[in-house]
Amino acid sequence: MNFLVLFFSYSIFVLPYSILVYGISKDRKCCEYGNSVDSSKILYIAGSVRKRRKTFEKKINVSNFEREGNANGYKHIDNKGIYATKQNLEFDEARNKEANENNKNDATTVNRKIIIESENKNNHNNQEQNIKDCYTNENAQNDEKNKKVKIPKVGNAMPEKKPDWFHVPAPNGEKYKKLKSDLGKLKLHTVCEEAQCPNIGECWNIGTATIMLLGDTCTRGCKFCSIKTSSKPPPPDINEPFNTAKAICEWDINYIVITSVDRDDLPDGGADHFAKTVELIKFSKPSILIECLVSDFQGNIDSIKRLALSGLDVYAHNIETVKRLQKYVRDKRANYEQSLYVLKKAKEINPNLYTKTSIMLGLGETQDEVLQTMKDARSNDIDVITFGQYLRPTKNHLNVVEYISPQMFNYYKDVGLKMGFKYIASGPLVRSSYMAGEYFMKNMVEKGRNQKNQQIKPVELKLVTELDKLTECIQKEIKHREISVFIQVHAFLVNVFVLVRA
């Protein structure tokens, strides 16, 4: 029953009105399309079942402008549905007034139209040309800035091929084979093999190798290094310090470089293991010169002190690259400031040490960044720095951004010597433990030792004379005591013999 009442009420009241509204709205569409509607009026139609139904017209006094969020501000809708800007409308009104006031003929008005339109076009073209000139000037300035400071991206596409100066013969030779067999028998690792150093044949054939302690597995994952990584590497070999000292003392060498993997899993970072190795080598062969290329020990002062006072001659730790590229190249646990801090502290703990660092080039650094790194190293009292070309060990590592020319390596060397570095090894194939640096370090350390010996020589002579006098007195005393003891023993035996006879 209720349903019927609702149906009849809807058909009587609502349906006729909706048809009426639909017809009106269809006949009187919005004047946007200009369908026979007065241009000074816009019809708004609203219909709703719930609200009171009305139709109303809103009159606009200015003209039928329609608001738009653009640069022109408004759009005009004429009877033909053609859009025009407000500026054009004002121009048309001014033109009509001028024509009516002067009462000129059609030819003059047409000519004036042409002149005005041409002037308007010229002004518009001039504005566009000025805008283009502004953009071209900005682009030219940006290009000049980019030319001045062009920072390459880390990990860019590899250059097509290596230059000629990187071609190195395959490692071979009797000393190379002997050294490799000796290392294999004693289960010792070398960074030469693990890091795929290009100088392995040249160095091993003259009896120079860089021993790697604490195993062959690193706890850090730097993006330039090919050494194995693991968060839980095997524990260090207890016999490794003894085996290393034994092997080094058997080789006919006077300079040895000892390095290690990072061992963040150990409480001291492996500093005590390192120091024991140095102490055993120095005890067996005091004349040998030892360079230790170590990790940062996470900035632990006790670890740095333990190694710095172990008897080594050169304390080396590599910065690896410029400050900006640290997070892209090195492990996140290593950083630029910490590396400089370690070298500075080692020098403060033992001023007799020579500190040394190394930087790889070709990773995307700029010349200014390299020079700034050299200044930072020198301000932290670093004595020796080396520069070498980064070479990608495998396809899974960082790409080489560029190959640095030998001329640029020589430039960095000259600038570094002027800064006050005691020595710089700089070249495409130079590495932190390259033999050219070792030759110099050997001479430099020996000069330092000779200077110390010359300073304490008079004291040593006095000590020698005093020792000679003491030894003579001791020998006389021993002889005197030996005679007295012999007499006493002889008298005792005589007395015993007499008693036995009795």
From Swiss-Prot:
Please give the GO cellular component terms listed in this UniProt entry: apicoplast; mitochondrion
Leader peptide range in chain numbering = 1-16
Compartments where found: Plastid, Apicoplast
What is this enzyme's catalytic activity, as reactions? [[Fe-S] cluster scaffold protein carrying a second [4Fe-4S](2+) cluster] + N(6)-octanoyl-L-lysyl-[protein] + 2 oxidized [2Fe-2S]-[ferredoxin] + 2 S-adenosyl-L-methionine + 4 H(+) = [[Fe-S] cluster scaffold protein] + N(6)-[(R)-dihydrolipoyl]-L-lysyl-[protein] + 4 Fe(3+) + 2 hydrogen sulfide + 2 5'-deoxyadenosine + 2 L-methionine + 2 reduced [2Fe-2S]-[ferredoxin]
Necessary cofactors: [4Fe-4S] cluster
Query: GO molecular function of the protein, one example?
Result: lipoate synthase activity
Q: Which residues bind [4Fe-4S] cluster 1?
A: C192, C197, C203, S433
Task: Quote the pathway field.
Answer: Protein modification; protein lipoylation via endogenous pathway; protein N(6)-(lipoyl)lysine from octanoyl-[acyl-carrier-protein]: step 2/2
**InterPro entries xref list:** Aldolase_TIM, Elp3/MiaA/NifB-like_rSAM, LIAS_N, Lipoyl_synth, rSAM
Q: Does the keyword RNA-binding apply?
A: no
**Where does the Radical SAM core domain lie?**
204-422
Record-linked PROSITE patterns: RADICAL_SAM
Q: Which NCBIfam families would you find in this protein's record?
A: lipA (TIGR00510), PRK05481.1 (NF004019), PRK12928.1 (NF009544)
Protein's name in the database: Lipoyl synthase, apicoplast
Q: Which organism is it from?
A: Plasmodium yoelii yoelii
List the taxonomic lineage: Eukaryota, Sar, Alveolata, Apicomplexa, Aconoidasida
Gene behind the chain? lipA
